């Protein structure tokens, strides 16, 4: 069912000379400027009783503006009963701990069976929120924390916070090779020119920055803590591959098994059996979109990564007398 939106306000004198869409976005901060622009173009906005369909129209201050519009639900998406691990929930947001193998949003090759379909089952009212409240994504086989908006105002403010880089997202990962120090990868990312399922570092891509630090050294692998400044598709995976340290198990970006010399059969079996990128969204910190208080959540590593790290530790311990560090 569509959500009816009826709003009115008086343009402030201080807004003299602003574009109409800019002025309305300031007057009605619960709605994004792009949504307001769509309403203007669709003749859903009046100024002093007259319909205006030009977002660039300048305001003088003192005008009475009104919006009479609808937010349409998207009937393409069907509710599905899929288990969700809810870490936190209130009237405005919820935080989930996503398992491996679960796609976040329907798309090519995954028309259903996603986080979005599950959200519609447990929270039917979220149909009225753009993208069913999803404001950022994790790859299908990346595990960990995601925030979801339950209302339009919460969604608008979370999107703005992401764009302003006010939401902190930290990950744990296991990379191939011995890394000597932490650092930063500041390389633009775009879709690969020939492999449409891949992303790649490209000078004409969108800016992307990943910070990383070393948590633990193993014989031929490194455990990392990473922080995103931006949120490009496959960003951590692409950046780590770019610096020649792809993530264990990442078949798209060169993470094939590379057992160190002399490794035991059991260790090799664990390494070869790890069939997803070793990446987990372990910490999420943000200001609540409605209440304004800072909130932080943590998610422990999933069992498969714990098993992998324990195997790496055991292998390193076995060969510690032969290592130079």
Swiss-Prot record:
Coiled coil: none annotated. The keyword Manganese does not apply. It is found in: Cytoplasm. The keyword Cytoplasm applies. It comes from the Bacteria. The active site is at 139. Residues 18-91 form the S4 RNA-binding domain. It catalyses: uridine(1911/1915/1917) in 23S rRNA = pseudouridine(1911/1915/1917) in 23S rRNA. Keywords: Cytoplasm, Isomerase, RNA-binding, rRNA processing. Its main location: cytoplasm. One of its GO terms (molecular function) is pseudouridine synthase activity. InterPro entries: PsdUridine_synth_cat_dom_sf, PsdUridine_synth_RluA-like_CS, PsdUridine_synth_RluC/D, PsdUridine_synth_RsuA/RluA, RluA_PseudoU_synthase, S4_RNA-bd, S4_RNA-bd_sf. Its EC number is 5.4.99.23. It holds the Pfam family PseudoU_synth_2. It is an enzyme of class 5 (isomerase). One of its GO terms (cellular component) is cytoplasm. GO terms for biological process: enzyme-directed rRNA pseudouridine synthesis. Belongs to the pseudouridine synthase RluA family. Responsible for synthesis of pseudouridine from uracil at positions 1911, 1915 and 1917 in 23S ribosomal RNA. This is Ribosomal large subunit pseudouridine synthase D. It comes from Yersinia pestis.
